[in-house]
Amino acid sequence: MLLLFDVGNTHTTIALTKDGKSFDIKRVSTHSIQTEDELYVFLKMFYRNDFKDIVVSSVVPNINYIFEFFAEKYLNKKAIFVSAKEYNEIIWNVNTPEEIGADRVVDVIAASRDYGKDAIVVDFGTAITIEVLKENRYEGGVIIPGFNMMVNALFKGTAKLPKVELKPSDTFVGKDTGSNIRIGVINTILGGIDYTIERIKSDYDLKSAPIIYTGGQSKLIREYLKKDIIYDLELGLRGIYYFYENIAC
């Protein structure tokens, strides 16, 4: 069994898998586990200690040592960390491939393996990323503030606007300050994504490319999805598995 970690800025997804198709998933706050010993105690509650390897996709480099120490101390193994430069089945057509976030790398890998050589991926996390895959070449992407980042910016940058909890709305105009913020944030982000995708389709001749939405925050906008959009919450986990498959061969 492989032990996979998808370490995000806010939450970490932990998954156990044998084949990269089905996953036994747990989720924790990223900064709730501070040491390799705490990680061991947490995992022991749910999993047997029979891991073939440990593979980590992390966008929080200052806690990577926890996974390194855990693998060495409790598994007598070296943790494997996702990076674009280690994966050779995709051409990383950007200035500095080593700077591509691991979360983006695994999204692109899984999109390529599961949906074809052309794809557009939108990952709704703390920040929202849009990835462009053209003929199995990663052409780059876009990063925009996530839902909660925009809410927090309004709250911290003004004297009176409240911090609200986001939820879908069936109207485009709010009747109170809270609904004004909710509608404004969600519609601004969705409108920006729609515009960006249309430009990408036109500029890169990707009019028939599949569009995949993923990431924990995508649940907020699931009911707004157009019929041609694919909703795939396990895209990143499969990407981690495919990365391991590639480098283990």
From Swiss-Prot:
It comes from Thermosipho africanus (strain TCF52B). Pfam families: Pan_kinase (PF03309). Transmembrane segments: none annotated. Its main location: cytoplasm. GO terms for biological process: coenzyme A biosynthetic process. This is Type III pantothenate kinase. CDD domains: ASKHA_NBD_PanK-III. ATP binds at residues 6-13, 126. Keywords: ATP-binding, Coenzyme A biosynthesis, Cytoplasm, Kinase, Metal-binding, Nucleotide-binding, Potassium, Transferase. Substrate binds at residues 101-104, 177. The lineage of its organism: Bacteria, Thermotogati, Thermotogota, Thermotogae, Thermotogales. Its cofactor is NH4(+); K(+). PANTHER family: TYPE III PANTOTHENATE KINASE (PTHR34265:SF1). The keyword Cytoplasm applies.
